[in-house]
Curated annotation (Swiss-Prot):
Pathway involvement of the protein, from the record: Amino-acid biosynthesis; L-tryptophan biosynthesis; L-tryptophan from chorismate: step 5/5
Keyword Cell membrane carried by entry: no
EC number, UniProt record: 4.2.1.20
Family, per entry: Belongs to the TrpA family.
Gene3D superfamilies: Aldolase class I
Phylogenetic classification of the source organism: Bacteria, Pseudomonadati, Pseudomonadota, Betaproteobacteria, Burkholderiales
UniProt entry keywords in alphabetical sequence: Amino-acid biosynthesis, Aromatic amino acid biosynthesis, Lyase, Tryptophan biosynthesis
Originating species: Burkholderia thailandensis (strain ATCC 700388 / DSM 13276 / CCUG 48851 / CIP 106301 / E264)
Enzyme kind, highest EC tier: lyase
Protein known as: Tryptophan synthase alpha chain
Amino acid sequence: MSRIQNTFAALAAQGRKGLIPFITAGDPDPSRTVELMHALAEGGADVIELGVPFSDPMADGPVIQRSSERALAKGVTLRRVLDDVRRFRERDRQTPVVLMGYANPIERMGEDAFAAAARDAGVDGVLVVDYPPEESHDFAAKMRAAGIDPIFLLAPTSTDDRIAAVGEVASGYVYYVSLKGVTGAANLDVSTIEGKIPAIKSRVPLPVGVGFGIRDAATARAVAEVADAVVIGSRLVQLLEQAAPENAAAELKEFVAGLRAAIDGAAKPAA
């Protein structure tokens, strides 16, 4: 099994839910990315989503857009992100790392070259926002051949056909976008999420992580009551945007530890 599959199997065996925090590689300072990744793991992250900066992040709200702009302005590239993962792996061989981003940087490197470089760096999963599952069979096969889980998005508007298409290509887990719109939006409706997850699981036999709209321990716990994992990004990126550089890792670890405690208080099994 992959590191991601092992992680979710262990969580299920313990009756626990996953915590998947997101930060943008290179923000606020490229020299601190690995330190921040360790802070996430030490705070209780089960999987780390590491954003690959891109100039046109269409699915992201203003907070993550700004973080991408800052990272790009400091020269962060896909190869630099892979190097960050490689350096993270020098100390942490257990926590899965998922790269989340857009197709252009991967296509510029070449899918085969990317698969090999990501494997060698210690990447466990890849979520390419603008790769529709119906057109991603070759890409997903290349990732799986390299031991990397291809991860896909589903949304409240996803049809049964789209869910089935994700089921054909995805592995690791599915990222369910709980809201229409972009990352960082508000008005989370947990009852709607709870109603959608059985439809997803009937066609996609994978854990479901839920993100978008999760801002604090209370919303994280509410989502953990109905999902297999909680994904949180914009709030963490905002924290890093506002923190003094010398305090960023400690503040991030403390915030994530609060989420971990709240999620561990969620006892209801996922649908």
